[in-house]
Amino acid sequence: KTVKTTLGIHTCDDIDGFDVDHPDFLAQGMSADTTEYVSIHAALNGTIFFILSETGELHKYNLSKSFDFRTATYENEFALNSEINSFSFSKDGTRLFALNAEHNTMELTTFSLSSPFNTSITPTQIHIVDLSTIGIDLVDGENSSATDVEFNDDGSEMFISVFNQEGDVLERIHQFSLGKNYDVSTASHIGSVGM
């Protein structure tokens, strides 16, 4: 199969990677203004993947071949808050979690999706949890930012990585136990480890 681009005609063998800034993908709906991507998530055995831009746009792609980004087609964009720098989904795809990256703001927003991994219908915000009230300490004079959120397979455990620009330990991963799977409002802090 050949691909016609502004740079000429190429065979699929010439495509070594997946470039979301490539004109062929921009033509599918990706904004040309987006310059940096901060998080990625694959779902449904690699047939769907999401990319989060630095400005908080969550872009969804469908893949006709699992984990082969060369087979991707653009589906839609869901605009999150511009401070969001990380996201995750529940295993069944009915919950979306968005982590605020603003300095000294440790908020995790939970959204409900109308159907698994469906961001074409605006997700409904369920709640926002201030992680500094349930175990992540903010130290005066230090610029801490939450950088990633992940869950174990069944959603009974949550992990938040935090970057601290001025402390002795620059990275710390916090572990939380969830009283109800994938319900961040039931989180209790277990501990943390410095990296």
Regions found by a protein language model. Give the residues of each.
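Short glycine/acidic-enriched loop and turn motifs that connect beta-strands
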Residues: T55-E57, E102-M106, N164-V169
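Beta-strand-rich domains and repeat architectures in extracellular enzymes and scaffolds
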Residues: A32-A42
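Residue-level detector of Asp-centered blade-edge/turn motifs that repeat once per structural unit
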Residues: L44-N45, K91-D92, D153-D154
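Short loop/turn segments immediately following beta-strands, especially the blade-tip
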Residues: K4-D16, N62-R70, T110-I121, F176-T186
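Beta-rich catalytic cores
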Residues: E36, E83, S145
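Surface-exposed loop and turn segments in beta-propeller and other repeat-based domains
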Residues: L7-A32, T73-L80, T124-G141, S188-M195
